[in-house]
């Protein structure tokens, strides 16, 4: 089923590739696929490294890691309650499922027995929202940070932001800065604040995520007696500054789309656009009228508050704040649609898809990876997202409306994505 932006969701709410780790771990493809050689098993190996958190190294190193841990996987397969190695993984339940698959494959491999894999293997986007925003404006530096460009090892924008935060803290002459440096500023502190940028993340949300990360990182051993509010507030200012310095084009796109949404709202119109697949996306954010009703329940009078949409009204604040995340979601939905269509044309019919993580059988992963890159490149070569929004606004809004033109594009060659091993990996 689809939402209004074209994003796709399984009808089943629990057993779904889009659910939590323990839910994904229970899923396998009904149709098995033979693993005939080491090439067919390559993405099964890489998937194992990924779910264990060994995903900041090259694909070759991930594959080597999996073969170095065959004995561990076999031990887990034989007795997962005693051998708890799988519990050390970033995604422990998917790691357990992988251990079972990897152990059976390697046991059979020794004797030349055929092995049919049923395990979905996934290739994950690198901060996918920022990948789309960087592609829209052809931002070369932003694109490099989120792996739109080829590189020998994966780039990590969360680490880039963390390094910039450290530089900013070193410039401060305050005890709080020294305390934070002593605790250590790492990618875990900056990951979630960076991830929410394409979705209109706020400074308040940034502070909350930093607070949670600090609590997890150093609860019971910190200079603040476990009072993490002040250090989180202090650090969030530098994280927010670093994000704005590292992620420039993304903010340009977001600010532009927000301004167009405000123009629509001022004229009492809902902001709308067509995605590259041709789907019309319309934001429907009405102003709300607050009402109160009284009713009887078990002999008592109960008063309930509720909100009712006001017809023919537009909530300008929600329209503006929702514009950027809804646009990005509509674009990742379009990219997924094009990818699936291309894969089906190649004979692939089994998918485990999230909007920033595409999965299928290990032997089919090379084809899936090729087609998802082709789909992304073709989508942005053939569709100028902001120009289309501008043209639509000029047509839809009142004559004489001063519609701002889109920001200028950078020098990124979008076809470089075709050769980027870590665009999705």
Features from the language model and the residues they span:
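Conserved catalytic core of nucleotide polymerization and phosphodiester-bond processing enzymes
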Residues: 1-425
